[in-house]
Regions:
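Short alpha-helical transmembrane segments in multi-pass integral membrane proteins
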Residues: 1-19, 76-143, 189-246, 302-367, ...
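Residue-level signal for short hydrophobic patches within transmembrane helices
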Residues: 12-31, 35, 57-64, 101, ...
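Transmembrane helical elements of multi-pass membrane transporters/channels
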Residues: 17-33, 137, 171, 204-208, ...
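Transmembrane alpha-helix boundary and packing residues in multipass membrane permease domains
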Residues: 22, 26, 38, 74, ...
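Helix-terminus/linker motif at the lipid-water interface of multi-pass membrane proteins
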Residues: 27, 31-49, 118-125, 181-192, ...
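Alpha-helical transmembrane segments and their lipid-water interface positions
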Residues: 29, 33-36, 40, 62-69, ...
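Small-residue-rich hydrophobic transmembrane alpha-helices
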Residues: 48-111, 145-159, 163-164, 276-338, ...
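Short runs within selected transmembrane alpha-helices of multi-pass transporters and secretion channels
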Residues: 69, 73, 138-157, 164-175, ...
Length: 448
């Protein structure tokens, strides 16, 4: 680990040194979803609404693998803190082997069952056709996305986060270029609409993976971390990762699944409500990436600091990250509340849709007053290695969230802006549960 960071205090400056590159990389990656939404918002309302369903459906599948990589990141962080650098490479290679196999299984299963599942879930024929087209062309990119997730886990776990910024810039530029060409039809190619968005995103993920491979070979100390040659597969190594990785995999999958169900509920309120929620989802991502940079930093620094033997410093570290997070997020919330129509125009140029989106945008932005504390504290729990407990805590929050959504959306069929108050419920419950667990100290002396 960087010697400037390897200390038990982790000042605000050192926290920022880790968080800022993660933030920039996540902002750049968020641009992929933003460009998909912004471009499709200029194709039509059906395409805009369908992309909400299709993107979240894809994310449910992607989060199975991404959740596994988060568990691997926690283990890598612990080994890095302990100074067992070659073991970080073993974790990387075995995680990569597992995710490549998993991607093949998920792609095959989705090809078989996606048409049936979409038919069950979507009531609009136009939305069904467009969403299925997106999913069919987006799935092949999952192989590249899973491999990239393991590279990200390695670089975040070893606190070499500057790499992420460069990768994200390359990925976003590629995605914008591919989408512009394929969605609208340039350089003699046909205008593919929502299908072009899916193909463009998959190609961008391939470019991202190529960048990581080239960068690792050229810049990373591969011998130090055991990346100079592929590790021989050992079932015992993978089994040793599973107690941590399984729970992060399940937790991330269930979390996004409930998000997907939320959009299915909204879809039954009509195509306009779905389009408004997709704008709110896209705008939410702007704040979300900032929050995730701090919460991801919290997870990896907690894991590293425990590996260094400074369990007594964990709570003070978490409090520093909380203060820094709220300072930045509250400033963003204020900007959203002052300029909601400006934010909405990023995603659509339909005047009536811009006006209709404002109430939902305001509710969504203010919900981060709860979500900020919830995510930072929750990722701190995961960073201790208590991933099974973290899963249970989020499960409690998600059950309450789904009950609330079912009542206000499915039964009462309230206005779409009121639907977004569900985010307050989720964030508040998660924050309370995570804080109680961290204060209890039951995570101390946990080995992974």
């Amino acid at each position: 680990m960087d010697q400037q960071l390897k200390c038990c205090t982790y000042s605000y400056r050192n926290i920022w040194k880790v968080a800022f590159p993660i933030l920039i990389s996540l902002v750049m990656e968020q641009m992929i979803g933003l460009t998909d939404t912004a471009f499709l918002g200029r194709v039509g309302e059906v395409e805009l609404g369908a992309s909400a369903i299709a993107i979240v459906y894809y994310m449910v599948l992607f989060m199975i693998g991404f959740g596994f990589s988060i568990g691997a990141q926690i283990i890598i962080g612990r080994r890095n803190g302990e100074g067992n650098f070659k073991d970080t490479g073993k974790v990387f290679w075995h995680g990569l082997y597992f995710l490549l196999g998993l991607s093949g299984v998920l792609i095959a299963a989705s090809e078989l069952f996606s048409p049936w599942l979409m038919r069950l879930m979507v009531s609009s024929e136009a939305v069904y056709t467009a969403a299925l087209s997106y999913v069919s062309w987006r799935l092949p990119g999952m192989v590249f996305a899973f491999a990239t997730a393991m590279f990200r886990a390695f670089y975040v776990g070893t606190t070499q986060t500057k790499t992420l910024t460069l990768n994200a810039i390359v990925m976003v530029v590629s995605n914008v270029l591919f989408n512009w060409i394929l969605i609208f039809g340039h350089f003699g190619l046909p205008a593919l609409g929502i299908t072009g968005a899916a193909i463009g995103s998959s190609l961008a993920e391939l470019v991202s993976l190529i960048f990581f491979i080239v960068y690792t070979r050229a810049k990373c100390d591969r011998r130090k971390y055991g990346l100079d040659r592929p590790a021989r597969f050992q079932a015992s190594e993978l089994r040793g990762m599973m107690p941590v990785c399984t729970w992060t995999m399940i937790q991330h999958t269930i979390s996004v699944t409930t998000w997907f169900i939320f959009f299915l509920y909204i879809e039954h309120l009509g195509e306009r409500a779905l389009a408004i929620s997709n704008i709110a989802r896209g705008a939410s991502g702007i704040i979300w990436v900032v929050l995730q940079s701090f919460s991801s930093t919290c997870s990896t620094l907690v894991s590293n600091i425990i590996g260094e033997g400074h369990q007594d410093k964990v709570m003070s570290l978490v409090k520093r990250i909380m203060k820094l997070s709220y300072g930045v997020i509250c400033a963003m919330i204020l900007l959203f509340c002052i300029f909601p129509e400006t934010v909405a125009r990023i995603y659509t140029d339909i005047p009536s849709l811009v006006t209709a989106s404002v109430p939902a945008l305001l509710v969504m932005a203010c919900s981060y007053l709860c979500n900020t504390g919830g995510q930072v504290l929750f990722l701190a729990v995961s960073g201790t290695g208590s991933t099974k407990t973290a899963f249970r805590l989020e499960l409690i929050a998600l059950v309450v969230y789904m009950i609330y959504c079912t009542v206000i959306i499915w039964w009462l069929r309230v206005d779409v802006a009121v639907c977004w108050t569900a985010e307050f419920v989720y964030g508040g419950v998660l924050m309370l549960c995570s804080w109680i667990y961290l204060r209890s100290g039951r995570w101390k002396n946990r080995s992974i």
